[in-house]
Amino acid sequence: MPREKVRVLIVDDSASVRQILQTILNDDPDIEVMGTASDPFAAARRLQNEIPDVMILDIEMPRMDGMTFLRKIMAQRPIPVIICSSLTEEGSNVMFEAFEAGAVDIVPKPKIDTRQALLECSTRLREAVKSAARARVRPRAERRVVEKKLTADAIIPPPVQGKVRPTTERIVCIGASTGGTEALNDVLEMLPPHCPPLLIVQHMPAGFTAAFARRLDSVCQIRVKEAEDGEPVLPGSAYIAPGARHMLLQRIGLRYQIAIKDGPPVSRHRPSVDVLFRSAAQHAGANALGVIMTGMGDDGARGMLEMRKLGASTRAQDEDSCVVFGMPKEAIAHGGVEKVVPLHHIPREIMLWYQAGHVAVAG
């Protein structure tokens, strides 16, 4: 029996954008655009008759802006919503409001200036739609091109057993995707100032992560910033991988520092969780804790197994608290997960692991 297609409603005031999005999505045999709307009022009329699996929504529209419509939808009849908008530094705060209001993902409007740019945008959009269709949403208050899937070998060589130099410094590496922006907020705001350093890969487009880091920094006790190449890794700080670039952990003597590298997508993502986790296995070994959180796909599964093989502790977010139980599920299936915990237990797990290491060193 053929698999049912993901049915999508597109809401955007630009006729050309609606047409481009419709063409991109209908080219995928697993997706069907059930209709389009030029504004939220037209979309609301459409929703009275049929409910899509996923809605793609613009932010800036006449008569009613997308944010207001998103809040109404999530309060009255929640469905997975993807924000498709022009990403700018000035508009980043609006994007975070969208996540808080219940949007499951954000994608940039397709670029059609080059064939490669259009291909990358098309692939990202189709993957976002399929991921959103599997997302859990809760009520809130008011022909396909298959890319070669690269592994972390494209960026960093495999870790070698017995080659990790000793250090007493402990470090936490976290990977997340769909649903991760709010989940990371929940984790980081509960950590005390004396927590271990955290390196975080959250799948995000370029130009978005600096504002994300500033937003987290404003609500957390710890320092949160966008990671920079060559900067030292310090306790009480969290470092967010910049969008569209890989982040790696490195060692200078007994001290950790961050490396930011260009390169092809790994596990179809850049930044890639697999790349970060492999570098942690290579340079931190048993002094690392790997945490994999909500998200679609398998990025991080191989890297987490490499971490565990070299002595690291590992945790995965449980299915009930995930927006999409994809990345944790794959990491568990690969055998890389030591313990599965709900989202609200992750801060405690981090601190218990960190404090246990301090006791061991003191002893």
UniProtKB/Swiss-Prot annotation:
Domain of life of the organism encoding this protein: Bacteria
Stored Gene3D superfamilies: 3.40.50.2300, Methylesterase CheB, C-terminal domain (3.40.50.180)
Post-translational modification: Phosphorylated by CheA. Phosphorylation of the N-terminal regulatory domain activates the methylesterase activity.
A Pfam family of this chain: CheB_methylest
Swiss-Prot/TrEMBL keywords: Chemotaxis, Cytoplasm, Hydrolase, Phosphoprotein
Domain Response regulatory: 7-124
GO molecular function: phosphorelay response regulator activity; protein-glutamate methylesterase activity; protein-glutamine glutaminase activity
Entry function: Involved in chemotaxis. Part of a chemotaxis signal transduction system that modulates chemotaxis in response to various stimuli. Catalyzes the demethylation of specific methylglutamate residues introduced into the chemoreceptors (methyl-accepting chemotaxis proteins or MCP) by CheR. Also mediates the irreversible deamidation of specific glutamine residues to glutamic acid.
Protein name: Protein-glutamate methylesterase/protein-glutamine glutaminase of group 3 operon
Gene: cheB3
